[in-house]
């Protein structure tokens, strides 16, 4: 019995389970495998990100555009680069994101340049024709603001900042 | 030089601030749409006005109505169709765009939160409906933009497209975009572009690719011909005009003279 009592600790120690792992890899050694964005990485990496003109990892801006530039390490804000989001007044807006299934069907063809011409120009041309205010080539003697618009001005007006580009 | 540039930029910033202040001090006027087609309608150029939605100091607009949180299904209507959007004015389209944008943000926020909390996100098809509505709205805006450009300048106003060949020798459509530098000064682009494609591997790939396309076409033609053959074999008195209209690729007259359309029966001779 005494022999058994003496052997018990050895037996228990033999029955214990152990695990083993590989050596821990510090960040400094295998830097390329880590995604070290703006605030991640070691202290040295963060310092380099902050100070270098071309940091080792590009600054992750999450899709947001800059509103200024760096001049000799000094950030200068440019007013033209600040986006001007034009939001309509939605108070009293009756439009909803979905359309009821009971809504009546609408039949409407595509809006063409002929429709735009009829909406803007044709009324004045008819009136000028009746009043005899047209020249021989068909242009008006007293052109309106829209008739004085040249193609270049129209293109400039349409291509202002914020317009859609398809 | 750099200090002078900094002074110029700071001066520009000051002018910008003054402009914004003058904008805010301007009397309130109804907001005018910036769409290209709407620029034609007002006869006087309105000054730029700014508007914002009502101020709410919390983020609960990003979440759905509280009574919908534990529901399994939220009943909503369908997406906006193109015909319905065409009868709306530019102002209404602008408002609708932001209504849909808020709805999309709310739906994405709820989806993300439901995933975090291991809950069921009710009616996920709402995201698709909002996406379809936004696509249709952009289609209508594009139509009006094209109409304006065609009327005033004679061109569609859209980006010019060019057919170029990619690295595999396949033809793709390239849409031109604006660049700050002219091509001969753009060193990065000059270094990165590869002029032409080539190599034996590309040629072999193109041969196999064209063979694949040709095989698909050949099999489709054979399938059509076999279908006509079986129709005529089972129904000798089938209307040939219908067959010609339905299968334009198949030579029906030539097929009638062949033995392939003869069925497994003895032709009836005049008794």
Curated annotation (Swiss-Prot), chain A:
Main location (coarse class): mitochondrion
Entries under Pfam families matching the protein: MRP-L27 (PF09809)
Entry's Gene Ontology cellular component terms: mitochondrial large ribosomal subunit; ribonucleoprotein complex
Region (Disordered): 136-166
Cellular compartments annotated: Mitochondrion
MF term (GO), any: structural constituent of ribosome
InterPro entries the UniProt entry points to: Ribosomal_mL41 (IPR019189)
Keywords for the protein's UniProt record, in alphabetical order: Mitochondrion, Ribonucleoprotein, Ribosomal protein, Transit peptide
Lineage top rank: taxon: Eukaryota
Annotated transit peptide: 1-26
GO biological process, one term: translation
Coiled coil stretches, renumbered: none
Family: Belongs to the mitochondrion-specific ribosomal protein mL41 family.
Record note on quaternary structure: Component of the mitochondrial ribosome large subunit (39S) which comprises a 16S rRNA and about 50 distinct proteins.
Identification of the protein by name: Large ribosomal subunit protein mL41
Naturally occurring in which organism (per UniProt): Drosophila melanogaster (Fruit fly)
High-level lineage: Eukaryota, Metazoa, Ecdysozoa, Arthropoda, Hexapoda
